C-alpha cells in the first residue's frame, strides 16, 4: 500500500483482491475496547497484559466492567456504541462493522452474511465483575455462556432461581423496592450525592448482621427524628428485600475453568413452549469477591428487574423482565457444563451446544499442537498463555496472547494451534447454523 492508500482505506474502498488475501488470516481486534460499569473492577488490564492505571473506581465511581472483544452488530445499541477495531500490518486500522459491510460475504460466508445483513451475530465480552450486577433477563432465544477465567477465592455468581417463584408477589415486591429507594433519595435530598449514598449503603447491605446505626449518622445527620425513623425503616425494608432476592437464586462458585451455560434447561423450555432464554442472573456476589469471565452471547436487549439497591438509580423494567424470566426452580447442575473431548482431535474440547452458538476449547501443551478442523467464520479468545496459529498449508495466520481476540474468516479453513506458553487455552465461539 502507498502512504496515501493504507490497507484499511483500500478495504473500506472495496478492494476485493486485498480482502481475499486479508481473509485468509486472523483479524485481530483491539484488546482495549473497554466500557466503564459501576460494578466493574481493575483486574482486566493486568489480564490483558496492559499497564495498570490509577484506582479508577475511586476516581470515576466505575471500574472497567467489560471489554467488547468482537463487536460488529449495528442493530444492537451497545455493539453499535462500542465497535471493534482491526489493526493491519501497515499500522492502519478500521472499525470491524464498516469492514464487514464491504466484505461480509467473503469473510463470513454467503449464508451467515445474508442472515445477518453483513454483521457478526455474536457479542463476546470479557467481564471484570467486582460488585453485583442487576437481576436481569433476556428475550426468548437469547442465551449466554460464561467461561470463568480467574477469580478471588470464594467468588460466586447468581444464576437461576433455586425455588419456584410467585410472579405476582415478586413483581409487586420489586416495584415497591424501587419506590422505597426513590423515597430514601428524597429524604437525603441534596445533602449527599447518590454516589455517596451508594458508598455508605453498599457495604451495610452486604453484611447481614449490620444494623442501620452503621450508616445512620451520615445519612440522616441533622434530620428530624420522625424523618430519621422513616429513613431507617425504609433501609431495613430494602435490606430484607435485597437478601430475599439474592437468596432466591443459585449461588454458583466462580471457579477458574468452569463453564456455565445460562439457558433454560430442556425440561423448562419444553414446559414453557418457547425458545430457550437465559435464566435470571445477577453476576457477582454481595461479598465483592472479584472474578473475570468470558461471556458469549447474541446481541440483544437486557431487561433489569432489580438493581440490588444501587444508587444512583438506573433504569429498570420490572414487567418486561418478568415476562421473559423462568420463575421455576433450576438446579446448578443443569447450568454448569463439562468439557468433552472432540474425537480425533487431541487437545480440542467442546462445552456448549446452543441454538445460537457453540463453544470449543483449544488446549495445546507448551510447544504442543492442536489441529482444528475447518468451520464457518468464528471468533477466538486466548484466556491463558499464548498461541501461534498456522494454516493447513503451513502459512502463518497470526498469534494470540492472553486477553487477545480475533475474528477468523471462513477462508482460513483448517488450522493448527501451537502453545507458546504453558497452560495455553484458546476459546473458540462459532455461530450455530440456525443463529
Model-inferred region functions:
Residues 219-302:
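Loop-centered beta-sheet repeat module
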Residues 383:
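A cytosolic small-molecule/anion-sensing beta-strand core signal
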Residues 318-375:
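Functionally critical, mid-to-C-terminal surface segments that flank or help form catalytic/ligand
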Residues 266, 285-321, 376, 403:
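Non-heme Fe(II)/2-oxoglutarate
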Residues 1-222, 300, 305-336, 359:
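Transition-metal
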Residues 249-261, 391-412:
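Short acidic-glycine-tyrosine-enriched beta hairpin
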Residues 119, 139-144, 366-379:
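A short beta-loop-beta micro-motif enriched in histidine and acidic residues
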Residues 119, 129-130, 139-141, 151-154, ...:
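Ligand-binding loop in jelly-roll beta-barrel domains
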Amino acid at each position: 500500500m502507498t502512504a496515501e492508500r493504507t490497507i484499511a482505506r483500500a478495504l473500506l474502498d472495496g478492494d476485493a483482491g486485498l480482502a481475499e488475501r486479508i481473509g485468509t488470516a486472523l483479524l485481530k481486534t483491539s484488546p482495549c475496547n473497554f466500557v466503564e460499569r459501576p460494578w466493574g473492577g481493575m483486574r482486566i488490564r493486568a489480564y490483558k497484559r496492559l499497564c495498570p492505571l490509577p484506582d479508577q473506581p475511586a476516581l470515576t465511581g466505575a471500574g472497567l466492567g467489560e471489554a467488547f472483544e468482537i463487536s460488529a452488530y449495528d442493530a444492537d445499541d451497545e455493539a453499535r456504541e462500542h465497535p471493534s477495531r482491526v489493526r493491519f500490518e501497515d499500522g492502519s486500522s478500521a472499525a470491524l462493522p464498516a469492514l464487514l459491510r464491504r466484505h461480509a460475504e467473503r469473510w463470513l460466508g454467503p449464508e451467515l452474511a445474508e442472515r445477518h445483513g453483513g454483521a457478526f451475530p455474536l457479542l463476546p465480552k470479557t467481564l471484570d465483575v467486582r460488585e453485583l450486577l442487576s437481576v436481569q433477563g433476556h428475550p426468548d432465544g437469547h442465551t449466554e455462556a460464561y467461561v470463568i477465567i480467574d477469580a478471588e477465592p470464594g467468588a460466586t455468581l447468581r444464576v437461576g432461581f433455586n425455588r419456584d417463584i410467585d410472579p405476582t408477589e415478586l413483581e409487586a415486591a420489586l416495584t415497591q423496592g424501587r419506590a422505597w429507594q426513590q423515597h430514601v433519595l428524597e429524604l437525603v435530598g441534596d445533602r449527599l450525592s447518590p454516589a455517596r449514598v451508594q458508598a455508605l449503603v453498599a457495604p451495610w447491605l452486604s453484611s447481614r448482621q449490620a444494623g442501620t446505626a452503621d450508616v445512620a449518622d451520615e445519612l440522616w445527620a441533622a434530620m428530624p427524628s420522625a424523618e430519621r425513623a422513616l429513613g431507617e425503616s425504609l433501609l431495613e425494608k430494602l435490606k430484607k428485600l435485597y437478601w430475599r432476592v439474592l437468596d432466591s437464586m443459585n449461588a454458583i462458585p466462580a471457579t477458574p475453568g468452569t463453564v456455565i451455560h445460562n439457558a433454560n434447561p430442556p425440561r423448562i423450555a419444553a414446559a414453557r413452549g418457547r425458545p430457550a432464554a437465559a435464566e435470571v442472573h445477577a453476576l457477582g456476589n454481595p461479598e465483592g469477591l472479584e472474578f473475570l469471565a468470558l461471556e458469549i452471547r447474541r446481541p440483544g436487549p437486557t431487561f433489569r428487574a432489580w438493581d440490588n439497591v444501587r444508587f444512583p438509580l438506573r433504569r429498570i423494567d420490572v414487567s418486561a423482565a418478568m415476562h421473559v424470566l423462568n420463575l421455576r426452580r433450576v438446579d446448578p447442575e443443569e447450568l454448569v457444563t463439562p468439557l468433552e473431548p472432540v474425537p480425533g482431535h487431541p487437545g480440542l474440547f467442546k462445552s456448549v451446544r446452543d441454538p445460537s452458538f457453540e463453544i470449543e476449547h483449544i488446549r495445546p501443551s507448551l510447544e504442543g499442537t492442536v489441529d482444528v478442523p475447518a468451520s464457518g467464520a468464528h471468533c477466538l479468545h486466548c484466556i491463558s498463555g499464548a498461541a501461534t496459529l498456522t494454516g493447513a498449508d503451513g502459512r502463518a495466520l497470526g498469534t494470540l496472547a492472553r486477553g487477545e481476540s480475533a475474528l477468523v474468516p471462513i477462508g482460513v479453513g483448517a488450522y493448527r494451534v501451537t502453545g507458546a506458553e504453558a497452560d495455553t487455552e484458546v476459546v473458540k465461539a462459532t455461530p450455530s447454523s440456525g443463529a
